[in-house]
Design a protein with these regions (language model features):
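C-terminal catalytic subdomain
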Residues: 128
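Short intrinsically disordered coil segments
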Residues: 68, 131-132
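C-terminal substrate-binding/catalytic lobe of Rossmann-fold NAD(P)-dependent oxidoreductases
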Residues: 1-112
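Short, hydrophobic alpha-helical segments
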Residues: 54, 133-137
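Glycine-rich phosphate/pyrophosphate-binding beta-alpha loops
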Residues: 39, 118-125
Length: 137
């Protein structure tokens, strides 16, 4: 998570520096792991923290390009691609089901990918219900 996104949440800040502190407390782990800690509960803003192993070696830029292509193409209106620092309060009222946080993408050892995506767990879902009803009408 970008340090520039931290102040935007003001009294509702959710991100912590716990992952960075691990390398300071256990120097043998410095540079060997990465992560994020998120405080809960949150209001409507929610975060998906997804880590997966992929079949081939990839870069951060390749992962972000694939997500951008999906957001601009077949997932337009459902997936939003974000290039700005973002926190939970930024997505309140956003109709997208997923706001991909491109600044937080990381790739470890070439095949372990970590992505973050935010969503308004009330409004985003409501918009998908309306989409489904419109298809049925």
């Amino acid at each position: 998570m970008s340090p520039w996104s931290m102040p935007k949440a003001s009294s509702r800040t959710l991100a912590t520096g716990a992952a960075k502190a691990i390398g300071e407390v256990l120097p043998g782990l410095k540079g060997k792991l990465d992560g994020i800690a998120v405080r809960a509960p949150v209001m409507d803003g929610s975060l998906v923290d997804l880590v997966c192993r992929v079949k081939r070696t990839v870069t951060k830029d390749e992962v972000n390009a694939a997500m951008k292509a999906a957001a601009d193409g077949p997932m337009k209106g459902i997936l939003e691609y974000c290039t700005d620092p973002i926190v939970s309060c930024d997505i309140i009222g956003n109709p997208a089901s997923s706001v991909f946080d491109s600044l937080s993408t990381s790739v470890m050892q070439g095949d372990m990918v970590k992505v973050l995506s935010w969503y308004d767990n009330e409004w985003g879902f409501s918009n998908r219900v309306v989409d489904a009803l419109m298809k049925l009408a």
